[in-house]
């Protein structure tokens, strides 16, 4: 009798890249895209203004606050949150279509959003990014030059809070050190590959 292992189909993964502001979530996901990895990278909808280096439909889907409210009312978002006064959300149909096509889905979310996804699916794969130390995080946030001193303090206070309870919510913790972006990406890809070898695969249903 043939083993069921030979007949087993690959289950697509729902992968959340999360962590505090300044740990490099955007940089990690951008690098994964550049490498041409065979994943579907979710484009998040946001009501915040577009930054000079960002591309519509690639970095984010930029919408007005009124349009974002309409999307919430129409139940078009898998999760949504108010983050530092700016609304962000994951388009539901985009994720479902990719999973139904057997594609691994990668999304970047803040910790609040990651918690929402965990509530929706115990089998989602949650990866927490960190810097090597807090000094590195402070320097990165300051180098953005997009934060007032008050906003910077708020983000740092929030980061410290988000570091608490990581073990209960996340499956893995990956260090994204300065000048080591590719190493962080390699670690994440190794995690994904290992997850596909599990004898009891994750099965995401949304």
Language model: regions and residue ranges:
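Conserved phosphate-donor/acceptor-positioning beta-strand/loop module used by diverse small-molecule
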Residues: 105-110, 119-143
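Short hydrophobic/aromatic beta-strand immediately N-terminal to the Walker A/P-loop
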Residues: 14-16
């Amino acid at each position: 009798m043939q083993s069921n292992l030979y007949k087993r189909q690959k289950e697509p993964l729902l992968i959340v890249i999360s962590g505090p502001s300044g740990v490099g979530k955007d940089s990690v996901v951008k690098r994964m895209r550049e490498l041409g990895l065979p994943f579907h990278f979710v484009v998040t909808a946001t009501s915040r203004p577009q930054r000079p280096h960002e591309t519509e439909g690639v970095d984010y889907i930029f919408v007005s606050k009124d349009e974002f409210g309409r999307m919430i009312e129409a139940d078009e978002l898998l999760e949504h949150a108010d983050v530092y006064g700016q609304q962000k959300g994951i388009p539901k149909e985009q994720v479902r279509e990719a999973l139904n096509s057997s594609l691994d889905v990668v999304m970047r979310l803040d910790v609040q959003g990651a918690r929402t996804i965990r509530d929706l699916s115990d089998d989602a794969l949650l990866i927490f990014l960190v810097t090597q130390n807090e000094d590195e995080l402070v320097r990165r946030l300051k180098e953005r030059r997009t934060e007032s001193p008050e906003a910077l303090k708020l983000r740092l206070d929030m980061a410290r809070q988000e570091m608490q309870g990581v073990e209960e919510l996340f499956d893995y913790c990956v260090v994204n050190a300065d000048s080591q972006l590719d190493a962080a990406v390699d670690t994440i890809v190794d995690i994904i590959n290992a997850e596909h070898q599990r004898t009891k695969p994750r099965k995401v249903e949304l």
